[in-house]
């Protein structure tokens, strides 16, 4: 698979993951839905940063980590200089290594804005790549 095929695969996978996250967020919240939505966010964010990384590589930028992918995506004009992207990374790191009820509640309330920001960035990649 060449890098452009990899990008297409990641874009399709991101779309599927994002739809699953949106489904969880649309349901009435209880602790199981909240935890499911957080888990879906983690998976969606992984696909998000890997998509950023791949597109940055296509553009000639080196991006080997989530943080580097976000920073290079800003330089490439894919994302705006918005602290939400680094906040998402921090939240993903927290959720992957700790579990606290209060933290889970706080994170859950941010998921709709995180989902929207990721979708906007991916839309910019699509527009730039396919136009």
Residue ranges and their predicted role:
Residues 1-131:
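Solvent-exposed interaction patches of small proteins and small membrane subunits
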